[in-house]
Amino acid sequence: MSKLIYGLAGPTASGKTSLSILLAKKINAEIISVDSSLVYKGMDIGTAKPTLQEQDGIKHHLIDIIEPTGNFSVADFISSVNKLKKEIWARGREVLLVGGTMLYFKGLIEGLSALPESQAEIREALEYQKKAKGLQYLHQQLSEIDPQSAQKINPNDQQRIFRALEVIMISGKKYSELVKTSKVGGLDEELKLCALVPNDRSILHKNIESRFRQMLDQGFLDEVQNLRKNRMLTKETTAIRSVGYRQAWEYLDGDISYDEFVKKGIVATRQLAKRQLTWIRNWQSSINIVAMENETKELDILKYFGYK
């Protein structure tokens, strides 16, 4: 039986960091960060990078691994996870993926490939069949057409079942054969992914504003001033396009006032959270949704992971 990989996703300021530490302790896991901003050195305050104290003895990976002038693509992330998971398992621990960069999660779930683009009409047809005959029926159909793919896909994983059948219908070829020739990375193991979502969006918005102002008190602008000493960095650099940093850069350039900077920074963070929640909504049939306000969320997630 293949190993499981555990995951905790959610929008920014939803409480992932503190919850992930509790979960990691319960399941004896090391954490792999799924955050495209945490990879950068020298970008600590504006990314809400967990401090050593906050990490509380839990080993974290993919934090502070490249300079802000560098890039860390989805392919780089997938390759790193596939290497790290083996090392973590060799130490007798579990793998817990934690973060909010949904493209990274998508890369793990689907892999990167030259497979045909999704087609709305085929998705609608599959959705109709699922409603009429059930997801198990579609998984059985996949088993008859492409048993190798069906064996690797959990019968309850709607997203991957739909994608496999969609590719077969578009290309006329087995999904397993196409993936072998065009896939870069992805996970062979089942990912048990939970996502934190707010029942009340206004609470998340308050958290975002509160955290942004706390970052300012902690010296966020000083951090950005220090980054500006590197002449290779501009507001168009990938790292500096992270929410908050670009707005701070514009303020320090004199393009906007301090009040405009604060307002734009908070709005940009809210927009990021909205995009993250859209990703989660699209995945809700194949992942476990947990309300961030739920007082028993730790226990609920552990139960979903298979722990008491």
From Swiss-Prot:
Catalytic activity entry: adenosine(37) in tRNA + dimethylallyl diphosphate = N(6)-dimethylallyladenosine(37) in tRNA + diphosphate
Binding site for ATP: G10, P11, T12, A13, S14, G15, K16, T17
Domain of life: Bacteria
Keyword annotations of the record: ATP-binding, Magnesium, Nucleotide-binding, Transferase, tRNA processing
SUPFAM superfamilies per UniProt: P-loop containing nucleoside triphosphate hydrolases (SSF52540)
Entry-linked PANTHER family: TRNA DIMETHYLALLYLTRANSFERASE
Name of the protein: tRNA dimethylallyltransferase
Source organism: Francisella tularensis subsp. novicida (strain U112)
